[in-house]
Amino acid sequence: MSGYGRFAYYYDRLTENVDYGKIASWCHELIEKYSSEHEVVLDLACGTGSLSEALARLDYDVVGVDLSEQMLEEAMDKRYDSGLNIQYLMQDMTELDLYGAVDAVVCVLDSINHLENEEAVRKAFESVSKYTCDGGLFIFDVNTVYKHRKILADNAFCYDLDGLFCAWQNELGDDDSVSIYLDFFEEQEDGSYCRFSEDFTERIYSDEFLTKLTADNGFELIGKFDGFEDKPVGDDTQRMLYVCRRLNRG
């Protein structure tokens, strides 16, 4: 993945369909139901901080971690406006270095799919396990093979926004990965347009691999859901949500 550069500035405008309040409420329901502690939540791969803000409004102390400096700049601008209790850290999710344990870790919106190989996923889970308190939750999701093959595939999308045009092209690989190429055309003051590009790849990690990885890192798998609601996983599930609880180290 090349990383989010200028794309970070437009990320929220291109993802206006994402209901962060709904995601936060579902995570809150799961934490209340399955975790003994409900105070500190780590928003892993927090991006521009929209979910961090929604979680903080539910009275959590939130730590947001992301590798992109540009994304975190957008997140901190939001925090300045809202005044919410959120701490942001620029770190790699495979090498977390937090100040202490957290009660829950939330890593959603296919952030795991962005990791470049299975070893990176292993390291990320090891890091999460290290900083999740006994009885705490690890909530994460992944895009499914169905979504990559049937929804994203080789499709193209266009976004015509005020002052910005974005052409989004997907390329499905033989391994069911999807390479995503973004071309932005940004309107200048003189009416001309400046072009810039971003690209990244989302990879598929099997349910068997992820389930084993949770157990290998001291987590009990509580359940799997179709997205952000109490709905069982089906053949046409696009986003699979895993809910895991950290076993006592004892």
Model-derived features: positions:
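Conserved class I S-adenosyl-L-methionine
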Residues: 1-45
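Class I SAM-dependent methyltransferase SAM/SAH-binding core
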Residues: 42, 50-95
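A short acidic, Gly/Pro-enriched loop at the edge of an enzyme's catalytic core
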Residues: 94-104
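A short SAM/SAH-binding and catalytic strip from SAM-dependent methyltransferases
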Residues: 103-119
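SAM-dependent methyltransferase
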Residues: 119, 139-211
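A short glycine-rich, Lys/Arg-flanked "PGG" loop and its adjoining helix->strand segment in the class I
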Residues: 122-134
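C-terminal lobe and adjacent flexible extensions of AdoMet/dcAdoMet transferase-like proteins
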Residues: 201-250
